[in-house]
Each structure stands twice: as C-alpha cells, then as structure tokens.
Amino acid sequence: MARFRRSRSRSRSLYRRRRRSRRGGRQTRSRKLSRSRRRGRSRRRKGRRSRRSSRRSRRRN
C-alpha cells in the first residue's frame, strides 16, 4: 500500500507542476518581454482566426 500511496502523490505533484508551469509561463513574460509577447500574440491571433473561420463555414453549410 505504501508504494501505491507514494506513486499517487508523485503523479499528483507532477500534474500540479505542469499546471503551474503553464500558468506561470503566461505570467513570466516579464523575463523575456519582446520575444514571449510577440510569439504569444501571433499564436493567439492565429487560433482565433481559425476558430472564427470554422464557425462561419459551419453556418454556411
């Protein structure tokens, strides 16, 4: 039972770290202002455009 408990605690910690890293990555733009902001904005804009285009195509069909 001890082994299972340890494995569960480790898996939970890994998931928490991954979630924190994602949220922190968005907030830690202060470290690399120009690079991270330009990349993030371009990716977000592309994603929004694709979503809008998909919605329009569905309505037309």
Curated annotation (Swiss-Prot):
Subcellular location: Nucleus; Chromosome
One of the record's GO cellular component terms: nucleus
GO MF terms held by the record: DNA binding
Tissues in which the UniProt entry reports expression: Testis.
Keyword Metal-binding: no
Keyword DNA-binding in record: yes
Alphabetically ordered keywords of this record: Chromosome, Developmental protein, Differentiation, DNA condensation, DNA-binding, Nucleosome core, Nucleus, Spermatogenesis
GO BP terms, alphabetized: chromosome condensation; sperm DNA condensation
Protein family: Belongs to the protamine P1 family.
UniProt function note: Protamines substitute for histones in the chromatin of sperm during the haploid phase of spermatogenesis. They compact sperm DNA into a highly condensed, stable and inactive complex.
Protein name (record): Sperm protamine P1
